[in-house]
Every structure is written in C-alpha cells, then in structure tokens.
Swiss-Prot record:
PANTHER family: CYCLIN-D-BINDING MYB-LIKE TRANSCRIPTION FACTOR 1. DNA-binding protein that recognizes sequence-specific replication termini (Ter sites) within rDNA. Binds to rDNA terminator elements and mediates efficient RNA polymerase I transcription termination. Required for rDNA silencing at the non-transcribed spacer 1 (NTS1). Promotes the association of SIR2 with NTS1 and contributes to maintenance of rDNA stability. Interacts with FOB1. Interacts with the RENT complex subunits NET1 and SIR2. Keywords: DNA-binding, Nucleus, Phosphoprotein, Repeat. Disruption phenotype: Decreases the association of SIR2 with NTS1, decreases rDNA stability and shortens replicative lifespan. This is RNA polymerase I termination factor. It comes from Saccharomyces cerevisiae (strain ATCC 204508 / S288c) (Baker's yeast). Residues 340-391 form the HTH myb-type domain. The gene is NSI1. It holds the Pfam family Myb_DNA-bind_6. GO terms for cellular component: nucleolus; nucleus; rDNA heterochromatin.
Length: 570
C-alpha cells in the first residue's frame, strides 16, 4: 500500500508541476532517461519485426523493460509509443523499476537461503567428518592397553599370540545371542577388514609361524599362504600439528625419508625381528621428537605410554612413516616395549609369581590393571601367567613322550576339523537367508567379520590346546612342539624333491634383487608357478638343506651360495 500511495503522489506531483517534464520525473524517481528508453524501444520493435513470431523474452527483459505495459490486453501486438500518455509511461517506468527492485530482492533472498542451506550441509559434513576423525584418532593415537584384556580386544592392535577371540571357539555360542539382542542392527561392511588380517605381527620367540598360515581340508599340516601386500605409505603423508609447520617439520620429514630407504624396505617384514638399522631409524626419530618438544627420557616414556587420548600431535602416525613397510601395530608394540615406564623387567621372583597368581584369580584377562599393580608390563604379566604358571604343578618339563606328541597331533587335527565343520554350517545357514541377513550372519559378535578362508591362527587357540592336553603342557610348550613337528615333516618331504625342482628354485632365487636376500618371501616364490604343490616353508627348508652341503657357507653371501649350488647341479 505504501508503494501505491507513493506512486500516486508521484503522478500528482508530475501533473501539477508544469516546470517538470515527464522525462525529468522518470529520471528523478527511477533513474531512467525516457528519451533514450523510447529510442531503444523503437530499435527493439524493428528487430522484432525481422525475427520470427513467437520468440520469447528473457526474464531480465521482462523485469527491466516496459514492453509488458505497451501490450494491449488480449493482444500480442505492441502499441505505438506515441499513442501512450506521458504520465502513463512514467507510471509504467516507476512500476517496472519497482518490480525490478523487488525481483532483485527476491533473488538475493533466495540466494541467501540457498547459501544458508549449503552452509548447513557443509557444517553437517564437517561435524560428521570430525566425529569420524575423532574415532580414528582414538584408535590410532595412543591406543589404550585394552588390547591386552581378553574381554575388550580391539582388532587394530591385537597381539599375535592372543587368539582367544577367534571365529571358531567364541562365535558359536555368542552370535545367535547377539543377533537376537539386536535384530534390527545393520552391520556395515568394513573395507579395512582385509587389512586387519595382517595386523597380528609376531612378537614372541617363535617366528616360524609366519610360514604356517593355513591347513587344507585333507588333514595335512601345511598349506600355501597368500601373499601379504606391502603397506602403501608415502613418506610425504606426514600428519603434523598445525603449530609444527616450521623448521622442525622439515627435520622430521628428512629423517623419515632417509629411514624409508634403508635396506629391506622393498621386502616384507611381517613378523620379523627389527634390524639394527630399523632400531636406529626409530631411535633417531624419537630423539629429534624429544628435542622439538623439550622432553627428557622419562617424559618421553610417559608420552609413549599415555592413554588419556588428549595428546594428538600425530606422533604414532608420523613414526609409522619411518618404517612404511611395517604395520603400525608392530611399531607401536615395539616402541612401547623399548620405552617402557615400569621398573621391573626380566626374571620373575617367587614372590612376584605368588602375587601374580593371586591377582589372576580375580583379574585374569585384565592385564592392564594387573600390570599396574605389579609394576610390570601388561604383556609380561600375560605371558608369564599363560605360558608358565596357569598349568601349575601339572606342567611337565621333561622331554615330550611319543604319547604326548600323538595327543597333541590329535587335538590340533580335531580343532581344524571343528573349524571346517563350523564353516560348512555357516555356509549352509547363510544360503537359506536373505542378502541383508547374510551380511549380518557372516559376522560374529561386535561386528567382526568371519573370514571365508580361515588361517591356521584362526583355527588354533593354543590355550584351548593346552586345556585339552589336561594342562600337562603349557600353551607355549604346545606351540613350540607343534612347530617342530611340522618343520620335521616338511624337511622329510624335501629329501625326495627332484633335481629339476631344485634347479628351478635356485634360478628363481637368482632372479631376485640382492637387497632382498636378507628377507626372502618364500610364499611368493611358491605361488609364482600356478598349481605348484610346494609351500613356502618347504621351499625354504629345501634351500637350507642344499646350503648345508657347501663348506663354510656361513662365511659366504647368499648370491655366492646360489651360484655355487647351480654349478653343482649343472
């Protein structure tokens, strides 16, 4: 109403002011030169005559021109400009200008709303990514020692010999209860499940287990293992806090680049002992970190063992780049063992054994708490209890008898058969379910995926093996003995290997880069020839048997040994 009244007052002033022309009124109120506008209109009329009928104007022409007013009602023809009263033209100009300003205001309002919606979506994505980042940081940076507790094991930092949470001895009784409790819960497929199978690096005395990944259905003890992919990590992907973008950042970056090219970086180090060069690379990184942060050794150890989750400066993410071919889990456990905060390490006293036994009666499995009470590393408490004290006085320390070896073989084969039966049962039940339920049913409690191709570690829980041996042998005794039995059997099978296979093996070894001789991937060699019946363990034992025939082979390099063996065969 205000705009209409203003428009009327404008017309009234134009009619009663003889000194002011229509052009001046239009120019004064809307900033439009009417003469120039009329000229433009005439030119436009001429152009429209040349165009085809029915052409449409853009929205901008409709908003800024007065052609809409020049049209007669019910007709598409334009009236002549001279036939229109000047005051009416002024009114049309004012109305057009007002309409244009309102349209611009509407556009700005719509743009503001759309920008607000975009900003809301951006904020939502930011909040979502922040939550995901916090969840990752909670797992990656300063992961707690709950990996040692049997009840709350995390897959990211699972100890290699802690196999209590396997698919076969835990899932059978608990999965249906979990699905009954959460019938509508949809478990998303985690793309990192494949990588989690390789996070269990060997950190115990037995290293041969890297060659014993699986057992076939025919009951034999050996199976070829899949090739383990290397970590695809670039040294440039440093995660540094914002305040660290200075000269210290360049120093850390240079150390990581230097350490990434050490001998053995192109080979697999899964389950292998840290070499002196790797130790030096990690120590150098920590020394530089201490200088940058102004920390002494004690403070650095407390930083490494901190579990409050507050410190988020990318320490664990950056130090894992120092050895990019090793998993973060192995580096994490190795650093914590070396830079520990506990006073006691090494030999256990009888008093400590008694205290450990007393604590395990109440807190067995909660090794973080047990370690704090005893002032020892949680891993030490766990291993001491499971490997030496759990069996008590029943644990035998003498040479294994033939009956014990047969019982151990029987127990292991029974567990392997139980694992295969479980897999067949799962496959049969999953075939009768719909796709959505299949996805849920292929997982155990807490959403952990059950592998379609279970490995030997998935099948065998050495604590259960010790219990089925009536506790006469500890879990580590059973594990050691089984490794020896398998190795002896593989060595016997290699005594009759043909000369052609020996020659093929030596030629394959000769083709390898000399830098990889210190860490040969035997499983990769075994899978090189399709349908080859030998395993990586068998090939390694075959090479070691041939190597022993060379005098003073310990003083020769691997390349020299291979050349000498090829000369003997040829």
């Amino acid at each position: 109403m205000d705009s209409v009244s203003n428009l009327k007052s404008t017309n009234f002033q134009n009619n009663n002011d003889p000194k002011e022309s229509v052009e001046e009124a239009v120019l004064r109120y809307v900033g439009v030169d009417l003469k120039n506008h009329i000229k433009k209109t005439k030119k436009k009329l001429k152009k429209q005559k040349k165009r085809k009928h029915g052409s449409k104007m853009s929205h901008e022409d409709e908003d800024t021109d007065m052609d809409w007013y020049l049209k007669t009602s019910g007709s598409k023809d334009l009236r002549k400009v001279d036939d229109i009263e000047p005051n009416s033209v002024a009114v049309a100009a004012v109305a057009a200008a007002y309409n244009s300003s309102m349209r611009e205001k509407d556009k700005r309002s719509c743009h503001k709303k759309s920008s607000n919606s975009r900003s809301e979506r951006k904020k939502h994505r930011k909040r979502k990514s922040s939550k995901e980042r916090k969840a990752k940081i909670k797992m990656v940076l300063d992961p707690q020692l709950t990996t040692l507790d049997d009840g709350i094991t995390t897959t990211a930092f699972l100890p290699d010999d802690l196999i209590a949470e396997t698919a076969f001895d835990k899932y059978v009784d608990t999965e249906k209860a979990y699905l009954a409790k959460h019938p509508s819960k949809s478990l998303e497929v985690n793309e990192d499940d494949k990588e989690n199978n390789f996070n269990n690096n060997s950190s115990t005395l037995v290293r041969i287990y890297t060659d014993l990944e699986g057992i076939p259905n025919d009951g034999s003890y050996i199976k070829r293992t899949p090739k383990i992919p290397e970590k695809d990590v670039k040294s440039d992907d440093l995660i540094l806090a914002p305040e660290e973008n200075n000269g210290d950042t360049a120093l850390l970056r240079s150390d990581i680049v230097k350490a990434s090219v050490i001998d053995g970086a192109i080979t697999k180090s899964i389950g292998k002992k840290f070499t002196p060069s790797e130790e030096n690379a990690l120590d150098q990184f920590i020394e530089e970190y201490m200088k940058i942060r102004g920390l002494d050794r004690r403070q650095m150890c407390e930083r490494i063992w901190s579990t409050d989750g507050v410190i988020r400066d990318g320490f664990w993410a950056n130090i894992s780049k120092v050895l990019p071919y090793r998993t973060r889990s192995s580096i994490y456990k190795h650093i914590r063992r070396k830079y520990h905060i506990f006073e006691q390490r090494g030999k256990w006293t009888p008093e400590e054994d008694q205290e450990l036994a007393r604590l395990c009666l109440e807190k067995e499995g909660h090794w973080t708490e047990v370690g704090k009470l005893l002032g020892r590393m949680p891993e030490d408490c766990r291993d001491r209890w499971r490997n030496y004290m759990k069996c008590g006085s029943k644990r035998g320390s003498k040479r294994w008898s033939k009956e014990e070896e047969e019982l151990l073989t029987t127990v292991v084969n029974e567990m392997i058969e139980e694992a295969h039966q479980y897999q067949r049962m799962k496959a049969l039940e999953a075939a009768n379910k719909n796709d959505r339920y299949n996805q849920m049913y292929s997982r155990g409690p807490k959403g952990k995926r059950i592998s379609d191709n279970p490995t030997f570690k998935d099948m065998i829980n050495w604590t259960v093996v010790s219990e089925r041996m009536s506790g006469t042998r500890s879990r580590i005794q059973c594990r050691y003995k089984w490794n020896k039995l398998v190795t002896d059997e593989a060595a016997r099978s290699m005594l009759s290997i043909p000369v052609s296979e020996r020659k093929w093996l030596l030629e394959r070894l000769k083709q390898l880069p000399k830098t990889s001789y210190s860490n040969i991937d035997w499983n990769s060699i075994a899978t090189y020839k399709p349908g080859y019946p030998r395993t990586g363990l068998e090939l390694r034992l075959c090479y070691e048997q041939m190597r022993e025939k060379i005098h003073d082979f310990k003083g020769r390099s691997t390349a020299e040994i291979i050349d000498s063996l090829l000369e003997q065969i040829n």
